[in-house]
Regions:
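Long, positively charged amphipathic alpha-helical accessory segments at protein N-termini or as interdomain linkers
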Residues: 2, 6, 15-16, 91-108, ...
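N-terminal lobe of the biotin/lipoate ligase/transferase fold
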Residues: 1-100
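Short loop/edge segments at beta-strand edges and connector loops
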Residues: 24, 110-112
Length: 255
């Protein structure tokens, strides 16, 4: 069981995490977050579960969680950002996960735009969703899933070769509440970076990028193509060198 009081005891935030909604079981914490928004839940609310059964990822991907061992939570943000800041919000979420796990002794890297890797294998993922009204982002839901205290063998066979867990890396269990608390602490500070100077955020992300200046493969018009990941533009979009030309992509699926 996740103890919400332990999360709040370890918060150093001014706004985020003051209200935490815990559920034994949920289809998706992001889905529940949007339902709570419709019911009037406010900025900073955290939705956390011990058993997420239909975790959602980008491009209709799903997320496998082992009940009582992984981390699955969502954070509601109510703020007015320009509509082109969606990519920056996703970057901030990734950095917050890296900073949180670093405090637990787990060195991680980010695969654009939202995957968290350790030892070249997937450790976690992020799904950021926004509601835009009149060219302004007015609602944000950030969903985070991390493999924590399970073994690789507990996951489906078809993904075992490509994923890892904090337990497998460190050889000891981790307090899941502290991971969540540190993420919330980090993300509040990172949103301040967005409002002051997005370049600060972009540089932080690039410093933690798994594949900067490396050849990557991705789908373009349902065909796998290759290019060199050369950085990010001011909106957090990927800059990829293809045939000696830099192309910018706001949404692609890296292989």
């Amino acid at each position: 069981m996740i103890f919400t009081q332990l999360i709040q005891t370890n918060l150093r935030t001014k706004e985020l995490g003051k209200n935490i909604e815990y559920y034994n079981r949920l289809d998706s914490t992001n889905t529940e977050a949007w339902e709570l928004i419709e019911e009037g839940n406010q900025h900073g609310t955290v939705i956390v579960t011990d058993n997420q059964t239909i975790g959602r990822g980008r491009m209709k991907n799903t997320w496998s969680m082992i009940p009582g061992k992984g981390v699955a939570f969502s954070l509601i943000i109510e703020n007015c950002f320009p509509s082109n800041y969606s990519g920056l919000i996703s970057l901030a979420s990734g950095i917050a996960v890296v900073e949180s796990l670093n405090k637990r002794g787990i060195e991680t890297k980010l695969k654009w735009p939202n995957d968290v890797f350790a030892n070249e294998k997937k450790l976690g993922g992020i799904l950021s969703e926004t509601k835009i009204i009149k060219d302004k982002i007015v609602k944000v839901v950030i969903g985070v899933g991390i493999n924590v205290n399970e073994t690789i063998a507990e996951h489906p066979k078809d993904i075992r070769d490509y994923m890892t867990t904090m337990l497998e890396i460190s050889k000891h269990p981790h307090q899941r509440e502290l991971i969540i608390a540190e993420f919330i602490n980090s993300i509040e500070h990172l949103f301040h970076d967005i409002s002051i100077d997005p370049k600060i955020l972009i540089n932080k992300w690039l410093n933690n990028c798994l594949h900067l200046d490396k050849i990557i493969s991705f789908y373009e018009n349902e065909i796998i193509v290759e290019g060199i990941f050369s950085g990010l533009d001011s909106n957090g979009f990927a800059k990829i060198e293809m045939n000696n030309e830099i192309k910018t992509f706001g949404s692609i699926n890296l292989v």
